[in-house]
Amino acid sequence: MSNAFIKVENLSFSYESDSEAHTIPAVKDVSFEINEGEYIAVLGHNGSGKSTLAKLLNFILEPTSGKIFVDGKEITSEDIVDDDIYDLRRKIGMVFQNPDNQIVATIVEEDVAFGPENLGLHPSEIRQRVDEALKIVGMTEYIKHEPHRLSGGQKQRIAIAGVIAMRPRCIIFDESTAMLDPIGRREVISTMQKLNKEENLTVINITHYMDEAAMADRIIVLNGGSLIIDGTPEEVFSNQDKLTEIGLDVPQSVALANKLKAAGIKLEGKTLTPDSCAEAIYKALIARGTQS
């Protein structure tokens, strides 16, 4: 047994179709490990199986076959009981695409307190958790506000605070920025990074945005329910032709860097973001200037 926080072995899942004789495969024989504190992006186009995988990891869906281990315990075992599932969901929280579907109260602090209250915690402990969670997501000043009056990004941060208040060790973001405008996306992405770097939470970001995936420690690429690439952003985006074949692009900065490298211009360092790419190009130009 490995020391991975999440371990998936030969995981498969099929949805039932209209015909009882047929099923629709969504995840096919997928295996990987995630260590505690990692920042993982799961990348794929629509229908690739990434959201289904997210629901399997939180046991919202039960796999057709294969095994899932969380913190060393097999949650797909026949011996699993309801208390084990509740414990799993305290360890692994989820933030969904539409924050309106996750917000349950009419006042921000009451919404964030909903989960801890259902754990039967003492009011003082609930108060502490609510205050800490809102501080982490930068929404303390909105504690008495009505969630429906907030922007999309602010609502999503309230939804995240509600998950944080449960004290999970991992949060799965299931396309949590897909419905947000650019400002809201930046707010939520910044929150993901803060949770990972400052709070040491394991973050799994299910996304189809290349720039979001580029921020992860590791990227898992799904296509047609199968895992086709698993590596660092640099390793994954170096497979530009393979990504193009399955309908995915690479970040613009990476595409530019790849063209320059193909033209014989040597770039040093990372080129995953516009700033890092610009710095690499600048250094390459300086180097070429000193050689001429």
Model-derived regions, located:
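The feature captures the beta-strand-to-loop junction immediately N-terminal to the Walker
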Residues: 43-45
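Conserved ABC ATPase "signature" region
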Residues: 124-142
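Catalytic Walker B motif of ABC-type/P-loop ATPase nucleotide-binding domains
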Residues: 171-174
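Helix-to-loop junction immediately C-terminal to a conserved catalytic motif
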Residues: 58
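Conserved ABC transporter NBD signature motif
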Residues: 66-77, 88
